A protein has these predicted regions:
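Short edge beta-strand/strand-turn motifs with a hydrophobic/aromatic core
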Residues: 3-5, 9, 67-72, 141-144
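Short glycine/proline/serine/threonine-rich loop/turn segments at secondary-structure transition edges
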Residues: 11-17, 76-81, 148-157
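Beta-strand-rich interaction/scaffold domains
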Residues: 89-157
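Beta-strand-rich interaction surfaces with strong enrichment in secreted/lumenal proteins
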Residues: 7-10, 52-58, 71, 126-132
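Terminal domain-initiation and capping elements
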Residues: 1-26
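Residue-level detector of buried hydrophobic side-chain packing
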Residues: 21, 69, 83-85, 101, ...
């Protein structure tokens, strides 16, 4: 998650200069500060929290991925104007994919989540990312509204990623447990 200042806010006629802008704040990338796991409809009681990959899949086995971040501390008066989720897709079969991100509204733990106990999530899609899964590439999604809500009401239950149609194919993303060595 990365926060950046809003250009329209900076260009408002009422803005007094010099403007003090705090640096961009980024969440920790340490595996201990990120909870992530994927779930499978086919293996509905299995847990995949300690896997190097997060999967999204459609067809006869639906897979969805869940992520939750320890948010950086911000001061009173700080304003969140932009928050992005940036992940790495490991490529697949060259098919065009569309990933949807949803806000999770029920508590969950990465070590115990499975298909049968998956948390409730908002049906409203926060953002979509369309890309061709043909090589390693960054997948970037706007999660500004969700992050603002997490800070405002303390309801950080994370997010869920899924393929938009869940009809066929799969997407493989790096998890926080990816071994970069």
């Amino acid at each position: 998650v990365t926060f950046t200042p809003d250009r329209n806010w900076l260009n408002e006629a009422s803005r007094k200069f010099p403007v003090v802008i705090d640096p961009v704040t980024t969440t920790s990338k340490a595996a201990t500060d990120i909870e992530d796991a994927y779930i499978s409809s086919k293996n509905n009681t299995d847990n995949y929290y300690n896997n190097e990959n997060l999967w999204l899949k459609g067809g006869n086995e639906i897979r969805r991925s869940f992520l939750k971040f320890q948010l950086p501390e911000i001061k009173t008066g700080d304003m969140i104007v932009n928050a992005r989720l940036v992940m790495v897709s490991l490529g697949e079969n060259g098919a065009e994919k569309t990933i949807a991100v949803h806000k999770v509204i029920q508590s969950w733990e990465s070590k115990t989540i499975n298909w049968d106990n998956k948390p409730i999530y908002e049906e409203t899609v926060q953002d979509l990312c369309k890309f061709t899964a043909d090589k390693i590439k960054y997948v970037v999604m706007d999660i500004t509204r969700m992050v603002k809500e997490w800070y405002r009401d303390g309801s950080n239950n994370g997010l869920m990623l899924k393929e938009i149609d869940e009809l066929s194919g799969s997407v493989q993303l790096m998890s926080s447990d990816w071994d970069s060595s």
